[in-house]
Amino acid sequence: MTEFIPAGTLYHALPSPFPMKRGGVLHQARVAYETWGTLAADRSNAILIVTGLSPNAHAAANQANPEPGWWEAMLGPGKPIDTARWFVVCVNSLGSCKGSTGPASVNPATGAPYRLSFPDLSIEDVADAAADVVRALGIAQLACLIGNSMGGMTALALLLRHPGIARSHINISGSAQALPFSIAIRSLQREAIRLDPHWNGGHYDDARYPESGMRMARKLGVITYRSALEWDGRFGRVRLDSEQAADDPFGLEFQVESYLEGHARRFVRFFDPNCYLYLSRSMDWFDLAEHVDEQPATDSAIDHAHADALPASAKPQTGVSTADTVLAGLARIRIARALAIGANTDILFPVQQQEQIADGLRAGGADAHFIGLDSPQGHDAFLVDFARFGPAVRDFLQDC
């Protein structure tokens, strides 16, 4: 069991015990985070970034760690998220292996890694932990909450469970619930890991490690993170040179196969398999429609001034999750301004889900807009297609 923590990581100790949504508690748990920029005297210029499944908190280079981060082109002085103006915080998700407490962390009660004794993890737990970091920094209200991919789910849960925590929100390639296709893919990824004999019920080590299972899980993920349009343009049917091809008659032959293999091998030893299982399942469980029947965070679940924006079928229906009940869940969120952005080629979090987020937040009274970008790079476009995503983020933040 290994944790992979970047240099310069900061830590916030969560309240102990820290209750989990689906039962159980954590003791002496922590959240890893990093910061950029300077917090204004009135603490009004703070932005929080919540991430996808695998990133650490090192979104960009800073004084504590000059190494480029995973969102380097988006975050820094003069960049779309301009740290000359904004004080930016990025948190590593609870349940991860990148500094925050997760299955790879030591359980203080036993002195051994949690492994599968870690409590069931939900997106709501990740959101609550992030909110506690904001409070600990003395920030009463964020200028903007930014969430991408899984972080888009986390951001919505955070806004719903902690009313007033942000004035505005940017949801990038996120969703208000997991769709069947996405659940199916992640189920196969988890199965690949669990069927590897070296997984051993979660009891593996560096010598006996579920490398084959992790490699297959990562390949499945990468296929859904990009798009067929990109595969066609980038690889076509080009074959490997004879010296690159595998001796196995059914081994690597095409460039696209080699790309997947290389990508997977770079990942498998830098993310803990049990953490992968927990975070993956938390995404499948997330459904904002489940919050419709909860006690409202404000005086009414749906602001009467905007109730007409929702169809009649959006009234709470216990145990039933439909597009309308998702909209009703979104409409319970109180936010002044919001932007939902997605790539039209995204098959994992289809662009219709970002449009749904904008529609639901608008029904709750937000000045909410949706932008579907014609990027060929699928779900991962927000990590690489800065020419398209950068201007949208910059323009929105200029008015915050």
Curated annotation (Swiss-Prot):
Top class in the EC scheme: transferase
Presence of keyword Cytoplasm: yes
Residue ranges of the region described as Important for substrate specificity: 52-55
Pathway entry: Amino-acid biosynthesis; L-cysteine biosynthesis; L-cysteine from L-serine: step 1/2
Catalytic residues as annotated in Swiss-Prot or TrEMBL: S149, D346, H379
Localization of this protein: Cytoplasm
MF-aspect GO terms: homoserine O-acetyltransferase activity; L-serine O-succinyltransferase activity
Binding annotation for substrate: R218, D380
Catalytic activity, EC: 2.3.1.-
Residues under site feature: Important for acyl-CoA specificity: R186
InterPro entries listed in its UniProt record: AB_hydrolase_1 (IPR000073), AB_hydrolase_fold (IPR029058), HAT_MetX-like (IPR008220)
GO biological-process terms attached to the record: cysteine biosynthetic process from serine; homoserine metabolic process; methionine biosynthetic process
Domain annotation AB hydrolase-1: ranges: 45-385
Record field: transmembrane: none
Assembly description: Homodimer.
HAMAP family per UniProt: MetX_acyltransf (MF_00296)
Protein's name according to its UniProt entry: Serine O-succinyltransferase
UniProt organism field: Xanthomonas euvesicatoria pv. vesicatoria (strain 85-10) (Xanthomonas campestris pv. vesicatoria)
Gene transcribed to yield this protein: metX
